[in-house]
A protein has these predicted regions:
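S-adenosyl-L-methionine
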Residues: 1-32, 40-49, 69-96
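Conserved beta-strand/loop positions that form the S-adenosyl-L-methionine
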Residues: 34, 57
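A short glycine-rich, Lys/Arg-flanked "PGG" loop and its adjoining helix->strand segment in the class I
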Residues: 121-135
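Class I S-adenosyl-L-methionine
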Residues: 148-195
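Conserved beta-strand signature within the Rossmann-like core of class I S-adenosyl-L-methionine
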Residues: 136-143
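Conserved glycine-rich SAM-binding loop
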Residues: 37
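Conserved SAM/SAH-binding beta-strand->alpha-helix loop
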Residues: 60
């Protein structure tokens, strides 16, 4: 049951696309943080851009609850959270042509070759993301894994629905990014723009 003002959103039907007018109290540009983790990035973006709507997805219950508390403490009203696998949200729950920007920040690289089918960013996901994005919408990605970054670049080129460009906007760092930068790791980023 969804109550007014609640940050956590539970769809009435997980087999139909969301009706965004029921998710957010007001219309606005929609940005989606896939795998929002501890929620620091999501809440910081919601504070920076109060006129935009932010949807965070996370499969772990504890992370969803922690992020909800952060959003409530920050007083942001433009954040909603779904406790669902990110790939499922993109392929089944987001209506076509409604998303202005996706953020995929430090997804699990699944470094062993036999685990590559578990990687989030690959052909089917990219096709679904392109369908959910508005024309000119963006899929912004960061990782500390050079091999996965190369894999993503090849998958995006194979998809044919995106123009590849650099990520130029200075945005808040995630917990993982702060940790990896402190360890001296290289951070790879790109922004894919839907054609």
């Amino acid at each position: 049951m969804n109550t007014p003002g609640s940050v956590e959103y539970v769809p009435e039907d997980y087999f139909r696309a969301l009706e965004l007018a029921t998710v957010f109290p007001r219309a606005g540009r929609l940005e989606v943080d896939l795998g929002c983790g501890d929620g620091a990035f999501l809440v910081a973006m919601a504070q920076r851009y109060p006129e935009r709507n932010y949807l965070g997805t996370e499969r772990l219950f504890g992370r969803v609850r922690n992020t909800a508390r952060k959003a409530q403490r920050a007083g942001v009203t433009n954040v909603r959270l779904l406790r669902v696998e990110s790939a499922y949200v993109v392929t089944h729950l987001l209506p076509a042509g409604t998303v202005s920007r996706f953020y995929v920040l430090f997804p699990d690289p699944w470094p062993k070759r036999r685990h590559w089918p578990r990687r989030l960013i690959q052909g089917e996901f990219l096709e679904a993301a392109a369908a959910a994005l508005k024309a000119g919408g963006e899929l912004c990605i960061k990782t500390d894994d050079a091999d996965y970054f190369g894999f993503i670049g090849k998958a995006a080129a194979g998809c044919g629905q995106f123009e590849r460009g650099p990520w130029e906007e200075e945005l808040p760092q995630t917990d993982f990014e702060r940790r990896y930068v402190a360890q001296g790791r290289t951070i790879y980023s790109l922004c894919l723009t839907r054609r």
